[in-house]
């Protein structure tokens, strides 16, 4: 039995990516939901304030989803998330998903994420807005919420080629790998409000999401 601890925010796509990699590898792990306002446990464990952070069996805590994925694949190589012949393409796709696609999905999901933190309390909601507006500028949250339809249309435009790609394959490159987990994490933005908001007409993408979502230690990912 492994002894791993994942420090996370539930709504973080990068944490969702790491959780699903841990599931795929059949590893036992404990999840610590970090309080958005009080990160002292995360700071004590990792020396920094960013999630995801993963405490390994050695007691070392590492941060950054790319680094975590690489270390996990080195420590627990079977099953691999980096098929040798496709490693570079998986990394390139993951960077795109965690960059341009993340920006589009984050903006499309902002109303749901604001509502999530509002449910946690006024202090959480205020701090969430403060962090976002410190990064993107004053008024960012209100402006982005008003532009929600345009943000969702942009997200759908970026997802459409992925839906087409998945018409003849179970996973992005045929065999499941890191890019699938990165995309899965980002699409979590579209489920923050509860129901999955991948358009109904994107049947291939919705089916792919279901396949990845069902992965647990006992599941054959090829099914």
What does each model-identified segment do?
Residues 51, 78, 168-169, 184, ...:
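Alpha-helix C-caps/helix-loop-beta hinges
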Residues 206-214:
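Intrinsically disordered, low-complexity polar regions and short flexible loop motifs
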Residues 1-127:
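GST-like domain detector, emphasizing the conserved glutathione-binding G-site
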């Amino acid at each position: 039995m492994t002894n791993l601890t994942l420090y996370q925010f539930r709504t973080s796509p990068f944490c969702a990516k790491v959780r699903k990699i841990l599931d795929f590898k059949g590893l036992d792990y404990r999840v610590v939901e970090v309080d958005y306002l009080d990160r002292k446990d995360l700071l004590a464990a990792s020396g920094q304030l960013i999630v995801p952070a993963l405490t390994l069996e050695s007691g070392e805590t590492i941060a950054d989803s790319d680094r975590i994925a690489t270390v996990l694949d080195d420590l627990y190589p079977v099953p691999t998330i980096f098929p040798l012949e496709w490693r570079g393409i998986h990394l390139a796709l993951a960077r795109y998903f965690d960059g341009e696609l993340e920006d589009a999905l984050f903006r499309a999901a902002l109303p749901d994420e604001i509502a999530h933190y509002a449910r946690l309390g006024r202090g959480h909601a205020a701090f969430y807005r403060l962090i976002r507006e410190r990064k993107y500028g004053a008024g960012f949250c209100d402006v982005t919420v008003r532009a929600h339809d345009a943000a969702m249309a942009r997200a759908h435009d970026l997802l459409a080629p992925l839906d087409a790609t998945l018409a003849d394959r179970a996973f992005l490159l045929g065999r499941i790998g890191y890019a699938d987990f990165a995309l899965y994490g980002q699409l979590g933005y579209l489920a923050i409000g509860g129901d999955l908001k991948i358009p109904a007409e994107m049947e291939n993408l919705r089916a792919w999401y279901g396949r990845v979502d069902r992965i647990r230690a006992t599941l054959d990912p090829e099914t």
